Amino acid sequence: MEKIYNHKIVEKDKNEKWIKKEYFSTHDLTKKPFSILLPPPNVTGKLHIGHAWNTTLQDFLIRLKRLQGYDVLWLPGTDHAGIATQAKVEKRLLDQKIFKSDLTKEELFEKAMDWKNEYANEIKKQWSKLGLALDYKKERFTLDELSNKAVNDIFVMLYKDGYIYRGNRAIYYDTFLQTSLSNIEVINVEKESKMYYLKYFLENSNSEYVLVATTRPETLASDVALIINPNDKKNSHYLGKNFVNPLTKKIIKMHSDDYAIMNFGSGIVKISAHDMNDFDVIKRLNLEVIETIDKFGKMTNAIPEFENMSSLEARENIVLKLKKENLIDKIENIKSNIIMSERSNTVAEVLVMPQWFIKMEPFSKMILKKIQNENEDDKKVLFFPKKFENILKIWMQEAHDWNISRQLWWGHKIPAWYDEKGNIKVQTTSPGSNWTQDQDVLDTWFSSGIAPFSFLNWPQKSEFLKRYYPTSVIVTAYDIIFFWVARMYFMGIYSMKNIPFKKALIHGLIRDEQGRKMSKSLGNGIDPMDLIEKYGADSLRWFLMTNSTPGQDIRFNYDKIESAWSLINKIWNISRYIKMLDSDKKEIIPEEIEQNANSWILEKFENLKILIYEKSETFEFSVIGKEIFKFINEDFSSVYIEIIKGTDSKEFISKIWSNFLILLHPFLPFLTDHLYFELNKKELLESDFFELKSRKNNLFIDETIEIISTLREYRTRFNLSHKIDLNYNLVSINNSNQCDFNLDLKKYLIKKMANANFSENGQIFFKLNNYELRLQIPEEVKKEEETIRIKRILFLESEIKRSQSILSNEKFINNASEIKVKEEKEKLEKYIKEFEEIK
């Protein structure tokens, strides 16, 4: 066994061995199932540090449950990531001077599949480096044939049941990527902007007007109304009156609607088709829809003089025109929220066009009913931490219908067909030669939303599906609760009449050392493969696991990674020490001590095992990590090994340490696999815990360690060498007359581990749990304490003199506050009292 831990040697070929031996792809159907769906990473590129954290948490659970005797299934897969992957592929084609217009959709699809295969292979290599216990025999892809069948089938089901409809509605549109977006694919970004206060003149009046504020004058041509709040008394006299659009000169009427906020600006709002809230008002008031911006972000012919201008260019020209006509009252510099596409980081326009939607109201009710049913925990998802259940609840109460169609070529084609008359048929196969399939594809989250059962080969009604659905837990970050978790939740209830997973562990994000989100723009991203190359996968895993608290972010820290490596190195050194132990005794120690020490460490191990099993159910990994660290550094290394050094306990110490390696395996799979084989010449994943029995009362060891620890702390405090003898006495607190049958054994261990001798008296008292420890003051300490005492006397003399001088000063007494004088007097009294005591 090598003297120094080398992660490159230890981790080499381990994952390949686990796959070859089918440790995680062979299933014992007599055991209780435990299943996890791996959140399918996008095939847009390589895995980042967040993926490493997410998969490490799941790998721990899978390995731990296997250790506990479960039949584990960890379903791997990748996501086709429609918009994101298509953008990457199109960029590659441009770099290769290939124009997508020169390729058919089928050829583009093949190019994307080439991309997918390339990056899926890269992702699998990264999974291997991390040591993930995935069942690769069950690997899936959200755009494979089985997924396509599942997607088509559930789309048809939802349509027939009235949950999917095609409607001409306002949607967010990405003018760069040329596709519609769902409400949660856009973000509000605060930017410097201008607020224009425009004059809307009362019809047939040259003097009376109302002021209406807008940040987007380019939408003026689509104005169809002005509104005030129904309770707005200040502006109520304008209700039903006509006003002149300052740009088009068309007449628009003043209406009332709750959307207008009284006392905000003038309290009057203009209504156009290029705002989601405005569109809702248009529907409520049954008004006309006029669009002035097209899907390319350019102006329509609603006003011919601005046609084909970009919206920003049109804004500049419209403002100039209105200024010339004195129709702008004022312009303010403000910060406003601009709606941006999260996909392309460009402005998302609100356009009205026919799209496919899922009605969210009935599904919101389904989830809310589950959440609010406190008496049926076995039938609802348990969130860790629970606050995310409340966050999901709030979102579901406000959910809009989900726009599921995308104007892309990469994705699941919508199983809808049109004839020449515009009739629609929704079915999985073509109705005939005169029918053309819808050219749009489905939102990526549609296929990943059904993954908990489609990856188990639904719609096949197999034993495989029945056994592993619902999955045991989903592990994901809080930033995709609405994108993914909510959709899996209602899709599972709808299709399977059951929740998709029993528990949801929601973790945070990994931030840099300054607490900033990692991003390409900041250049603060960290490649997990670089960390594995330098420190090893186990060091990275330990850092990620032991810094994990449900719902909270992690701040990346190189010092903590290095601390993880140091801990692993200590485990290596302990294992090497145990392997090199000679069975022949080198030191004769009482057999009673050896047996008690063995029993004591066994109890510590069993308690640790119970804690790990219990805390893993609630995902308290940081708590587990602290207890493991304590067991290694304090219980095993500082106490147990020190006690049994030189005994013939090699067999026991080897077995208890091997048991610990098995228990530690879910945290550090590479290291423990390697060390277990070194000690036992047997594979860890083919082994059970050694049966070890406890025969002694462990209070004896606990009491002795408490005494030794106190003596060691005293040495540290006064910087006393271990060579200097300490002298102590023990007095039982509970019963001073009771004979301590273990006293001689205690004396032996205290002498061995603390170099302290039992004596008849002591000047310093330490109160312990069951004893009063009385310690004689060593001469070295007496000298140091005398030096400290003299320094304190000199300090007190100086302070007393200073305080007396201040209090005898009439100016101080007359000018200082009563509180200040009182404080100084109290200070003097305290100093005099201490001086008399210490002298």
Curated annotation (Swiss-Prot):
Annotated Gene3D superfamilies: HUPs (3.40.50.620), Isoleucyl-tRNA Synthetase, Domain 1 (1.10.730.10), Valyl/Leucyl/Isoleucyl-tRNA synthetase, editing domain (3.90.740.10)
Pfam families: Anticodon_1, tRNA-synt_1
InterPro entries in UniProt: aa-tRNA-synth_I_CS (IPR001412), aa-tRNA-synth_Ia (IPR002300), Anticodon_Ia_Val (IPR033705), M/V/L/I-tRNA-synth_anticd-bd (IPR013155), Rossmann-like_a/b/a_fold (IPR014729), tRNA-bd_arm (IPR010978), tRNAsynth_Ia_anticodon-bd (IPR009080), Val/Leu/Ile-tRNA-synth_edit (IPR009008)
Ion transport found in the keyword field: no
Motif ('KMSKS' region): 517-521
Record has Manganese as a keyword: no
GO cellular component: cytosol
PROSITE patterns xrefs: AA_TRNA_LIGASE_I
Entry's family note: Belongs to the class-I aminoacyl-tRNA synthetase family. ValS type 1 subfamily.
Subunit-level organization: Monomer.
Protein name: Valine--tRNA ligase
Organism in which the protein naturally occurs: Mycoplasma mobile (strain ATCC 43663 / 163K / NCTC 11711) (Mesomycoplasma mobile)
